[in-house]
């Protein structure tokens, strides 16, 4: 879906797009939907990694999957970036084993941008590493700080550690040790942050272990979806509320766009040697287009 729009963006932004997957299925789907794929490269990859497959399958039984072939293409210089909506565990495994980590980085991490009252906040890690060591969290803070500075243009970004309280002594052993290491790091570490403060303009980078980070990002998405449904329900109550809805329709569309994670593109995998980005398995065509624009 959306290949036609992707192609328009390719021409506009001078991006060369290579679709990696079953050539037969890609061409058949394009033909059935009357979509021109002229000018878009196709790299044949017959295997498929499902969401049920083990992460290690990308290096073993599924080494001819679109994910494996695409990452090899990136590693060999045949591509400049790789974008996937596939199995998260397999993508992390493949990025680590095929593309390789940046020298000195212990573990790569998912790092999505999320909306806040003013601008966006980067969350790192949002699920790549369920169990973390303190030094990993320190590296996450450094990588997140560099990204927000160099890529997002936020000078001296504020880095905070996700915790159960703002006091220095809060949290378990991991948080205590990570707090001390983050204080020593060459970044603007502002201390602990509670989840309720993340949507406000309290920090620019949120550091978390993958378990905590994944809960934060999924809760973010769930609350946004539930809130929009509730607002719609309230506006549809009666004639007066429907009239009120008509008066603020433009504003509501802006709010919906602000709350929709599809409008924030893909999450880069920090810590690998070349750009690898992950988007939702349920991502819409617009999400891919936005991600391509970010890559360019």
Per-region residue spans from a language model:
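Glycine-rich phosphate/nucleotide-binding loop
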Residues: 99-107, 116-123, 202-206, 210-292, ...
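Glycine-rich phosphate/diphosphate-binding loop of Rossmann-like nucleotide-binding domains
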Residues: 18, 24, 131-195
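Short helix-capping segments at alpha-helix termini
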Residues: 10-13, 31-38, 152-153, 182-187
């Amino acid at each position: 879906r959306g290949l036609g729009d992707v192609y328009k963006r390719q021409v506009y932004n001078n991006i060369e797009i290579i679709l990696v997957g079953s050539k037969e299925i890609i061409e058949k789907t394009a033909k059935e939907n009357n979509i021109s794929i002229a000018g878009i490269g196709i790299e044949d990859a017959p295997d498929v990694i499902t969401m049920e497959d083990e992460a290690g399958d990308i290096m073993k039984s599924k080494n001819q999957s679109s994910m494996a072939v695409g990452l090899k293409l990136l590693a060999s210089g045949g591509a400049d970036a790789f974008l996937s909506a596939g199995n998260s565990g397999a993508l992390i495994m493949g990025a680590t084993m095929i593309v390789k980590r940046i020298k000195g980085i212990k573990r790569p991490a998912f790092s999505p941008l999320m909306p806040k009252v003013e601008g966006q906040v980067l969350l790192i890690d949002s699920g790549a590493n369920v169990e973390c060591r303190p030094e990993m969290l320190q590296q996450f803070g450094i990588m997140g700080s560099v990204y927000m500075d160099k890529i997002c243009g936020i000078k001296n970004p504020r880095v905070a550690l996700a915790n159960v309280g703002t006091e220095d002594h809060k949290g378990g052993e991991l948080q205590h040790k990570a707090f001390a290491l983050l204080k020593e790091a060459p970044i603007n570490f502002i201390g602990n942050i509670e989840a309720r403060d993340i949507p406000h303009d309290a920090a620019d980078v949120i550091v978390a272990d993958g378990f905590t980070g994944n809960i934060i990002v999924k809760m973010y998405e769930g609350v946004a979806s539930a809130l929009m449904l509730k607002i719609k329900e309230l506006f549809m109550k009666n004639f007066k509320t429907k009239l009120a809805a008509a008066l603020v329709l433009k504003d509501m569309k802006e709010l919906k766009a602000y709350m929709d994670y599809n409008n924030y593109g893909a999450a880069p995998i920090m810590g690998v040697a070349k750009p690898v980005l992950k988007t939702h398995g349920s991502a819409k065509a617009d999400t891919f287009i936005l991600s391509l624009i970010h890559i360019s």
